[in-house]
Swiss-Prot record:
Signal peptide (residue range): none
Residue stretches of biased makeup (Basic and acidic residues): 286-299
Modified residues (Phosphoserine): S253
Domain notes for this protein: The histidine box domains may contain the active site and/or be involved in metal ion binding.
Protein name listed in UniProt: Lathosterol oxidase
Coiled-coil residues: none
A single GO molecular function term of this UniProt record: delta7-sterol 5(6)-desaturase activity
Length: 299
């Protein structure tokens, strides 16, 4: 993140915002700058990517599903806009430690004895490390002692759109992002790779809420895509993984996506449109939700 801060200082903060007497490496100035940069970056990334996904990827037929809430898109956006600043405050504390030199982030490929190969290995390691810890954090957030207060707001959206991707309780959002920030404190990682992965991870988070259930058949058993995550929203206690199905299989929480079996929400909408199913005006009761004509436990 110091690469971003350096650019922001050079082009904006130093010439236009802060007095010349306030050094760029002052910890309080860095904290303020990081808070601004993180919030602005988060909003730009969220609105740009989620909007593109909503208009060009998301299947709007899903909005006809009886579990799709009234004014849902507006509510998802409002929830996210209110949550992101609080998530950023917690995140900035870790960014500050990183730019103050407490992590193993570096900008010299020479620090990798095996060059590009080791760089690729670090990326793969990052993905598997974060996927493992996010699985257990996410699963822990479904525990009855914390679910209602922290994670339930994200499960309001049974048929999520890309705008639901970051609609978290701030503590929930921060906890699920924590493995990304912990990794470079344990393992060496190139700064550009770290920043790139941070952006890509946020785009991936949007993509698994986009309602596009297509995955190359050869990858379906391994990749935790939108079909898997939509079933997680619908069925509650399956498919906690972020990128891969590995830990769901190990933890006994893997569920083959209903969409792959022709029983997903799009199939439901199609049957409803053809008159084979009736449309329900409500969205279920307090503890149960309608899915594919049956009630399924959600909490």
């Amino acid at each position: 993140m110091d690469l971003v801060l350096r650019v922001a200082d050079y082009y904006f903060f130093t010439p236009y915002v802060y007095p010349a007497t306030w050094p760029e490496d002052d910890i309080f100035r860095q904290a303020i700058s990081l808070l601004i940069v993180t919030n602005v970056g988060a909003y730009i990334l969220y609105f740009f990517c989620a909007t593109l996904s909503y208009y060009f990827v998301f299947d709007h037929a899903l909005m006809k599903h009886p579990q799709f809430l009234k004014n849902q898109v507006r509510r998802e956006i409002k929830f996210t806009v209110q949550a992101l600043p609080w998530i950023s405050i917690l995140t900035v504390a870790l960014f500050l430690l990183e730019i103050r030199g407490y992590s193993k982030l570096h900008d010299d490929l020479g620090e990798f004895p095996y060059g590009l190969f080791e760089l690729v290995v670090s990326i793969i390691s990052f993905l598997f490390f974060t996927d493992m810890f996010i699985y257990w954090i996410h699963r822990g957030l479904h525990h009855r002692l914390v679910y209602k207060r922290l994670h339930k707001p994200h499960h309001i959206w049974k048929i999520p759109t890309p705008f639901a991707s970051h609609a978290f309780h701030p503590i929930d959002g921060f906890l699920q992002s924590l493995p990304y920030h912990i990794y470079p404190f344990i393992f060496p990682l190139h700064k550009v790779v770290y920043l790139s992965l941070y952006i890509l991870v946020n785009i991936w988070t949007i993509s698994i809420h986009d309602g596009d259930f297509r995955v190359p058949q050869i990858l379906q058993p391994f990749i935790n895509g939108s079909a898997h995550h939509t079933d997680h929203h619908m069925f509650f206690d399956y498919n906690y993984g972020q990128y891969f199905t590995l830990w769901d299989r190990i933890g006994g929480s893997f569920k083959n996506p209903s969409s792959f079996e022709g029983k997903g929400p799009l199939s439901y909408v199609k049957e409803m449109t053809e008159g084979k199913r009736s449309s329900h005006s409500g969205n279920g009761c307090k503890n149960e939700k309608l899915f594919n004509g049956e009630f399924t436990k959600t909490e």
